[in-house]
Amino acid sequence: MGTRRRKRKKEIAGLPSYLVLLVLLLVWLFQELRPGPSAQEPPLEAGEVQVYFMPQDGERAKARLLALMGGAQESLYGAFYEFRDLEIAKGLLEAKARGVRVELYGESDYRKDFRRYLVAASLGQTQEPPRVPQAALRERVRPTSIDCEEIAGIPVCFDEREGFMHHKFLVVDQKAVWTGSTNMTWNAFARNNENSLLLPSPTLAQGYAQEFRALFGGQKEGLGEPVAFRLEDPLVEGTAYFSPKGGKAAREALLEVVRQAQKEVLVAAFVLTDRELVEALVEAQRRGVAVKVLLETRNLRDSREEDLLQAGVPVRQDGNPYTLHHKVLVVDGERVVTGSYNFSARAWQVNNENLLVLQSPALAERYRKEVLRLWEEGKPL
């Protein structure tokens, strides 16, 4: 008569199967819920944050930008929407002549301007606007691919997309970033209401450099990876977002800043057509937040100022006979939103843009004073 063997539940390393499953579940939860690299607090970096408001700071701002170019030792990566300034063109060419790696990425609508200004500067011209002989253009512009060419020795690529390549940033030696609303044009520095920031953060600069390299290398929508950074003078904690690849994250960050407002939201905007942003501003007004919106006069027809006015939100058109080109929100005297990112659907869906969300009472106070100054100069609707 054979011995009957008792069936036993499967065990691993002496553990019952249900305990094994429990251990595996806990390991999976740990992997899923633990903070990833993006959630880690970025290092606090030394360096002075500098902010410039045009036109009053225009000469100082351009001098600082040219000094950055003049002090560059390794690389200058510039993503520029418009390019019409001989001094800036000269600064880039001089850096190139010193052996600095200079690369530019531009909006294809302004390809002729990139050619004209870089070639004119290479010829030693200083008078605006430059006059460049066609023979010089033929001699000093060399196509290298469908989207790229070498202009006066500087490699320049263009986006060639439906959306705008709307950036206005320069990465210096992958150690600092110059960015904001200011195009590389004489008008932007001398006439328009603009803002530019110099952020000496290697962490941020490397993130911008990666976005630039992707664009320059043919990834037309960019990487879209947000970059968190911290600077100590004054203390700034911020995140940079890039669209269109990271456009949804950029827009959600923008909306969340408004939704979290408790006391005050100040807006200075070239255009305001994003319906959800308008709704968030209206909702802020309804819950007792003091909202003020200043808009560029020529874009009033395209903006949604009527929705704001009907909800009781004070709205003014700007008083500058040239252009109010800001894309700025100041919230509760503590947070600033700025960058190249217009408050429109195209900014997060189609265009190449960068958006900065900054936590800094000191920086917010400077932006707040500027927006309120422009508000006083504006005209009520």
What would you call each of these model-derived segments?
Residues 32-73, 82-260, 275, 287-335, ...:
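HKD-type phospholipase D/PLD-like phosphodiesterase module
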Residues 17-31:
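Hydrophobic membrane-insertion alpha-helices, especially the h-region
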Residues 373-381:
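Charge-patterned, long linear interaction tracts outside catalytic cores
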Residues 1-13:
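N-terminal Lys/Arg-rich, disordered targeting/topogenic segments
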